[in-house]
Amino acid sequence: MATKKPENMSFEAAIEELDGLVDQLENGDLALDDALKKFERGISLARAGQSKLNDAEQRVSILLKNDENAELSDFNPQPE
């Protein structure tokens, strides 16, 4: 099975995979190379999740602005 790029995954799917990786790493039964690969994947998932959270926070901030006379601005997600 091909592994999806973290930036192409939903936030929920990334968190679910990250949770599974943490469980595997905490178990301590992995060879060093396997543990490093899973750690790298986990870092990628965490960064992608943080980026999605930052984008959502920006969207919420735009929607909750109190200035009724302000023009709507385009949402520009952070480049990955």
From Swiss-Prot:
Among the GO molecular function terms of this UniProt record, one is: exodeoxyribonuclease VII activity
- Record's function text: Bidirectionally degrades single-stranded DNA into large acid-insoluble oligonucleotides, which are then degraded further into small acid-soluble oligonucleotides.
Q: Which organism's genome codes for this protein?
A: Vibrio atlanticus (strain LGP32)
Pfam families reported for this sequence: Exonuc_VII_S (PF02609)
The EC code for this enzyme is: 3.1.11.6
GO terms for biological process, alphabetical: DNA catabolic process
Q: Which family does it belong to?
A: Belongs to the XseB family.
- Name the reaction it catalyses: Exonucleolytic cleavage in either 5'- to 3'- or 3'- to 5'-direction to yield nucleoside 5'-phosphates
- Tell me the compartments it is located in: Cytoplasm
**Keywords for the protein's UniProt record, in alphabetical order:** Cytoplasm, Exonuclease, Hydrolase, Nuclease
Keyword Hydrolase assigned? yes
Query: Which HAMAP family does this UniProt record tie to the protein?
Result: Exonuc_7_S
> What does the subunit comment say?
Heterooligomer composed of large and small subunits.
Cellular component (GO) terms are: cytosol; exodeoxyribonuclease VII complex
Q: Which InterPro entries match?
A: Exonuc_VII_S, Exonuc_VII_ssu_sf
Q: Which domain of life is it from?
A: Bacteria
State the protein's name.
Answer: Exodeoxyribonuclease 7 small subunit
Recorded hits in SUPFAM superfamilies, A to Z, give: XseB-like (SSF116842)
